[in-house]
């Protein structure tokens, strides 16, 4: 099989753009896993906050300038990662918007250069914007074409094609059944042969709700991804299960209920978008968002890029980045003296810095509760303030001692709320 390389002049230009973005404080990819296995870092060892979005059809259903709009708007909203299916939704044989099918004669061993040149162009735009694509190069619906016999060769080919592109993570989507294990191992082996281990590898079981835990011990699995679909109540326990597995690996809540999705039996409002995300992060995971109109490629896909839920997750990211050493977050429900809850769809959750430098409490609805102030061990005096997850606006509560128990009630009129406790400076 022939591999098309990026022309030298264009490659050099992209390197310059990439270097410029790095100097501006952008992460330097490819992505790596931290030494403690809890979070992601760039090539300089700097922690990277995984806030992802979902654009399954980006390679197949959009013109190049439309893809550019999506990527640029996605990055501007604060998302650093985008989940994309290499062959799009379906069985892997549907042509792209230009009429090009992925494979000649539907054979993965004879890839169609016309299809993959378009993928190349989209990948380059993502690289220019320093947006990492989590590229699903196998889906269980592709199983009639990607088989145990050709999986390694197919994976090696695609990995070689993008072996020097830093803004890629490899992903696969099997069913969570042991019968898929041999195929996943062949695919992973092909990816490693093709790119020499340059990119991280993961998989996300489909359908939901399932984590990747049934192959957690596999050496090639760099981090674990799960999906919960409409079962919001499954997020916290599933993340907790994965978080506590050994060896320690980062956990990503990769797919929940899409904003404005119509198939869940309830309206996925911005509040539900926020709840899913905060449940993920305060359980110790990372998170990916999705909008119904984007993955379905509805006529309103462009408006969906500015959906309230997407905007409010950008606010979430800023809230976390404002916490000193946010990457040392530890889920800890013992922060609550009373009022914490991890069961059901409306939760009250707490997490803290591993050394007690701050405490974060998320309330899924109006709530009264009490806090063990001794969980904040840095300094003697503690300041408390509310943050409205919808707007990011803060409201001072007061100062307290870091001993004993203090009671709090979230502000009236707020749908949900964050309470932050930090040492007085």
Identify the function of each model-found stretch.
Residues 249-250, 259-261, 271-398, 409-425:
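Aromatic- and carboxylate-lined catalytic core of secreted/periplasmic carbohydrate-active enzymes
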Residues 19-20:
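N-terminal signal peptide c-region/cleavage motif recognized by signal peptidases
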